[in-house]
């Protein structure tokens, strides 16, 4: 079985646990995704599965090249807007998946499972150092210049080094970065609507594309009852 799905961000809300705690969650429309291609180590050099999400209308299919359309025709699937390849180290994780199989949210994920969500952050345009790099800024009464207290300040010496070092935090474009939020928890699943409820926030705006995958850093351990060991009785 595949370890992840492509999803669309719907928005945020909150739910209440049986204990009465309020938990902020993000609603994701995860899948259904169709297997477009299955790759094997014998033929392709590694094990992977290619999934598609979001069917493309026929009037927009002409935007694809002939080789791209040929991939979908060979698999016998509709043309998808988004395609993602998921590599695995062990072919057993993919089971007997083949082209044309449909993956739903309840087949891939389960409640209380830890996941990683990857997406593109919101674009905020050209911003200053206080918003982009969380700089403190100058004192409000240290200068009479307009908005000088929001400036970057000193960025180097005159003669030594005589330049601005690469990587110096300066104003510039902020956002539109590929990031991954790790170890989020699946709070709930609604298979009828392909909805996945995830604790916390995920990157991107509403209707943004996301890739939801099994957490790379392990799953929560199930607490088991410790065995009570009897001490050996001393010999008399």
Swiss-Prot record:
The keyword RNA-binding applies. It comes from the Bacteria. PROSITE patterns: RIBOSOMAL_L3. One of the primary rRNA binding proteins, it binds directly near the 3'-end of the 23S rRNA, where it nucleates assembly of the 50S subunit. HAMAP family: Ribosomal_uL3_B. GO terms for molecular function: rRNA binding; structural constituent of ribosome. Pfam families: Ribosomal_L3 (PF00297). GO terms for biological process: translation. This is Large ribosomal subunit protein uL3. Keywords: Ribonucleoprotein, Ribosomal protein, RNA-binding, rRNA-binding. It comes from Anaeromyxobacter dehalogenans (strain 2CP-C). Part of the 50S ribosomal subunit. Forms a cluster with proteins L14 and L19. GO terms for cellular component: cytosolic large ribosomal subunit. SUPFAM superfamilies: Translation proteins (SSF50447). Belongs to the universal ribosomal protein uL3 family. InterPro entries: Ribosomal_uL3, Ribosomal_uL3_bac/org-type, Ribosomal_uL3_CS, Transl_B-barrel_sf.
């Amino acid at each position: 079985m595949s370890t992840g799905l492509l999803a669309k961000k719907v928005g945020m809300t909150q739910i209440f646990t049986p204990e009465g705690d309020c938990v902020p969650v993000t609603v994701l429309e995860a899948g259904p995704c169709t297997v477009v291609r299955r790759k094997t180590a014998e033929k392709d050099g590694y094990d992977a599965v290619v999934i598609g999400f979001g069917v493309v209308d026929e009037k927009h299919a002409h935007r694809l090249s002939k080789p791209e359309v040929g991939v979908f025709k060979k698999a016998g699937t509709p043309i998808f807007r988004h395609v993602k390849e998921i590599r695995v180290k062990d072919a057993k994780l993919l089971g007997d998946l083949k082209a044309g199989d449909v993956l739903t949210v309840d087949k891939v994920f389960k409640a209380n499972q830890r996941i990683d969500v990857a997406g593109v952050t919101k674009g905020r345009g050209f911003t200053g150092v206080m918003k982009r790099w969380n700089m403190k800024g100058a004192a409000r009464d240290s200068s009479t210049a307009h908005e000088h207290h929001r400036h970057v300040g000193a960025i180097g010496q005159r003669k030594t080094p005589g330049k601005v070092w690469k990587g110096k935090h300066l104003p510039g474009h902020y956002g539109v970065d590929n990031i991954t939020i790790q170890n989020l928890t699946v709070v709930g699943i609604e298979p009828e609507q392909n909805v996945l409820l995830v604790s916390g926030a995920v990157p991107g705006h509403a209707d943004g594309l996301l890739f939801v995958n099994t957490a790379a850093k392990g799953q929560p351990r199930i607490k088991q009852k410790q065995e009570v060991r009897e001490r050996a009785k001393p010999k008399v």
